[in-house]
Amino acid sequence: MEYISFRSLQHYLYCPHRWGLMEIDRAWAENFYVVKANALHERAHSGVSYSLRGRKTYTDVDLWNDELGIIGKTDCIEESKDGLCIVEYKPTKPKTELVRHDDAMQLFAQKLCADAIFETDCKVQIYYADVKRRFNVSFDSSFDSELTVILSEMRRYIAR
């Protein structure tokens, strides 16, 4: 089975054409927005762990789920007395919604992996750098079936 990364999943849902240019054709150049997002993620992908306000924070955490064939890194996982919480960093808050669907699906995939690895039910938050705020993200039952369909679609395109 072809493993799909969290990043690839998010890119596919954002724009399948752009995903194809990046992942299949390898014909994509980074622009200002990609560079800005990379700078935001620099600390999150440092691999450094630290403690702050009663929470232990682990950055650049490897996650995977062999059953689903998904793999990748989460920006950070925080451990507190309340349990684990995945935090994903994004440069800008969407104008019309709290969380874009492509970002929510990326976080859902990360949650499935973390829940399986750590045998828990972790919380999920998204942090928007432009407003310097975190927002809780929740998922309904439709995410499970949608993720399965999307991963199958992506694997069909990759296999061509």
Model-found features: residue ranges?
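Metal-dependent nuclease catalytic cores that hydrolyze phosphodiester bonds in DNA/RNA
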Residues: M1-I86, P91-K95, M105
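Generic detection of long, well-ordered alpha-helical segments
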Residues: F6, A104, D140-D144
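Generic hydrophobic/packing signal
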Residues: F6-R7, F108-K111, V124, Y157
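Short, intrinsically disordered/low-complexity patches at protein termini
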Residues: R43-S46, A109-K111, A159-R160
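Residues in well-ordered beta-strands of folded domains
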Residues: D60, I77, F108, Q125-Y127, ...
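Metal-dependent nuclease catalytic regions and adjoining charged, substrate-binding loops involved
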Residues: D66-E67, L98, A116-R160
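Short, charged, amphipathic alpha-helix that recurs within catalytic cores of restriction-modification
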Residues: D102-A114
